[in-house]
């Protein structure tokens, strides 16, 4: 009867296989790399946005100072949650509110609306949240030498009705802010069914920047999501 001989892997072979497995795992993890996006989440108000990891958050205190908030008030007392991001190497509120954003800068927020003010938010009011966009607001800005904006060009304007009571407006337009170069603004605003919450988002940068980074900006814009409960 033939004798079957069992061959054991030598210690060297076993160790080599183990090293290969570890190397493959390391390569797999390295291939995954760091996340491409930062996920901005407001779970309470079910509001979501994703921005490239190269867009860094603007300091909250700097934002408070730029907007003029009382720093002693809590988010709940303000009735406002917001975050701001900037793709510039030196993130600053100036890139959101100043004459020029050389790289994309974005703002996302949710405002609680007092019951006494809930009837005041028309679609045009949503259009004019950050800049004068509606015809009446533009006319007023043109007549006001202190408005700080000029050379308006409307690129697109779309009424949004995603369902579950949400309704809003998505507007894309160009403006010159102060003496700066032309800026491209892309903004979206929603109201919930009883107008108790205002969801807002905008991103801006110079027209040259926008042309160069349109796909990147478009991915951020399309990621802005509100999941209002029924």
Indicate residue ranges for each PLM-predicted region:
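Bacterial N-terminal signal peptides that target proteins for export
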Residues: 2-19
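Soluble non-cytosolic domains of exported or imported proteins
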Residues: 46, 120, 124, 207, ...
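Bacterial signal peptide processing site
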Residues: 33-35
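Surface-exposed amphipathic alpha-helical segments
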Residues: 55, 195-230
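Conserved polar/disulfide-associated segments of primarily extracytoplasmic proteins
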Residues: 61-193, 198
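C-terminal motif of bacterial Sec signal peptides marking the signal peptidase cleavage site
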Residues: 28-31
């Amino acid at each position: 009867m033939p004798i079957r001989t069992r061959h054991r892997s030598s210690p060297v072979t076993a160790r080599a296989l183990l090293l290969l497995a570890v190397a493959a795992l390391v390569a797999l993890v390295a291939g995954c790399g760091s996340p491409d996006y930062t996920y901005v989440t407001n779970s309470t108000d079910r509001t979501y946005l994703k921005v490239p990891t190269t867009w860094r958050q603007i300091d909250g205190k700097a934002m408070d100072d730029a907007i003029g908030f009382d720093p002693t008030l809590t988010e709940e007392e303000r009735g406002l949650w917001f975050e701001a991001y900037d793709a510039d190497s030196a993130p600053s509120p100036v890139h959101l509110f100043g004459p020029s954003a050389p790289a994309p800068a974005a703002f996302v927020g949710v405002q609680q609306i007092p019951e006494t003010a809930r009837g005041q938010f028309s679609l045009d009011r949503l259009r004019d949240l950050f800049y004068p966009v509606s015809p009446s607001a533009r006319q007023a800005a043109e007549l006001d030498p202190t408005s700080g904006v000029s050379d308006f060009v409307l690129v697109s304007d779309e009424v949004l009705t995603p369902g579950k009571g949400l309704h809003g407006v998505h507007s894309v337009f160009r403006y010159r802010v102060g003496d700066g170069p032309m800026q491209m603004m892309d903004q979206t605003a929603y109201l919930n069914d009883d107008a108790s919450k205002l969801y807002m988002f905008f991103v801006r940068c110079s027209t040259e920047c926008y042309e160069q980074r349109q796909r990147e900006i478009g991915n951020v814009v399309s990621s802005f999501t509100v999941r209002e409960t029924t």
